[in-house]
Structure formats: structure tokens, C-alpha cells
Amino acid sequence: MNDYQGFAYNKKERNQMRHGSLFSGIGGFELGAQMNNIPTLWNCEIEDFQRTILKQVFPDTKQYEDIKELSKPGYVDIISGGFPCQDISIAGKGEGITGSRSGLWNEMFRIIREVRPKYVLIENSPMLLIRGFERVLCDLSQIGYNAEWKCIQNKVFGFPHNRERLYCIAYDSHQIGREKIHYEDTIFNSESRSFEIQGGKFSRMSGGSFWSEDYSEFLRMDDGISYNVHRLEAIGNAVNPVVAGFLFSCIKEFDNQLA
């Protein structure tokens, strides 16, 4: 059995946290929050197909469409979001965080300033580390947020594919209080030590690609079936809900230690 199975689901609730999701896709972060008994009060997703899925799975969640038109959606303890990575990833043009798509970080940052959540959870391509991550960290620091980050592969959680993503958890030092933060007991390390992952650190895993030649015809997506194209795009861009669940459990564990 994989060490990650069943993490944190049986932990006692102290105070129920609330979650809001930006660039929601098909709800990977929402599912991860749900695994930890954290309700998602609102989400924001511009693509019609993805919003249809979100409405089916989370019918009670307030839904917004365009983040550029979103303003003060209501307080939540955690805001999550994977702003578009097309300008950042290896497959993109490498324009970085100032590109037309990945530049939507500015909108996410605006919502963070307006809402002032206790925690922020960010997902993106690992290439962000060399294509604008310092901008993200500086912006968060200017409004009082400390941050930690890790590159995590799906394979670490027992999935048969690599898909490494960068995850960053930031926390508001004004709400938490700097005197309560013990840097030797950080969000990630307190959890990773308990699972004995490479001495308390996530590591890159070796191995071949999940995709094989058998999938080549299917992945071309040239059959003209619109639903399948949208479905593949949504799945390809989705946050792994198991990884998301682990990250939310890290936040809950950290928050409980501050009580």
C-alpha cells in the first residue's frame, strides 16, 4: 500500500476552514479540499466545458466565470489556483510570467489582496522557478505572506506517470503572527517527515514517460469530436486531487499546530 493512502482524513476538526478556487478547471483543488472536509464556497473558471463539470460535481458552490471581472468574492481561509502555464512550460514559448496567459497571476494576486486569505495554494509548471517565480514571491512578500514550495511528481503518490508540478503554499504572517511560526516545523516538512520520504524531502523520481506509442492516435485529437477534445484538454490541465488532498492536509496540520 502506498504511504499516502488515507492521509489526514481521520484528523479531528478544530475549526472548519473554507476554500475558494481560481482557475478551477474540473475541480482538482475542490476535490482535495473535500477530502479534508473543507467546503469550497466559490470557484472561478472561464471555460464552458469545465464550468459544466464543476456545476455537476459542486452544485452548491458559487460559480464565477472571468477572473478579470471578479471582485471581492467573499472571505475564505484558503485560496487555491493554478494560473495558466502556457507561457511558462517547456511546451510554451517561454515568455514567462509576463506572457498573455501566465500574466493572469496579476489577477490572482489582486484577488488575494482583496480577500486576504490565511493561506494561498498555487500550482504551476516547474519552469516557473526560472520564468517568474521570484515575481510571485516578491508580490506575496510585499503584502505580508511567507511562502514554501516543492516540486512534486504524481509518481510519488503511486500513479504510473511522472507529471511534475510546482506547488507553493503561502501563509499570511499578519493573521498567523510571526511569533507563532517555527521555521524548523514548516508546512511541508512536518508532513513529509511523518511519511519518511527521502529523509523529509520530496525528490524527483526516475522512470520513463507514461505515454506510449499505443496512445499516439488517441492523443492527436484530430477526429473532430468536440466533447473528447474538451475532455482531454480538461484532464490534461487538471490538478491531481490526491496531491491536492495531501497539500490541504499539510495546511490543516500546520494550522492546528498554531492553535
Each model region followed by its residue ranges:
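Conserved SAM-binding strand-loop segment of SAM-dependent methyltransferases
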Residues: P59-D66
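Conserved SAM-binding motif I beta-strand of class I
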Residues: T40-E45
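Class I S-adenosyl-L-methionine
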Residues: Y9-R14, E69-I78, C85-N237
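Gly/Ala-rich phosphate-binding loop of Rossmann-like dinucleotide-binding domains
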Residues: Q34
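Class I SAM-dependent methyltransferase "Motif I" SAM/SAH-binding loop
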Residues: S21-G27
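Short alpha-helix immediately C-terminal to the canonical SAM-binding loop
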Residues: F49-T52
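Extreme N-terminal starter segment of soluble prokaryotic enzymes
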Residues: N15-H19
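Catalytic phosphate/metal-binding cores of nucleic-acid and nucleotide-processing enzymes, i.e., regions
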Residues: G144, L232, A244, S249, ...
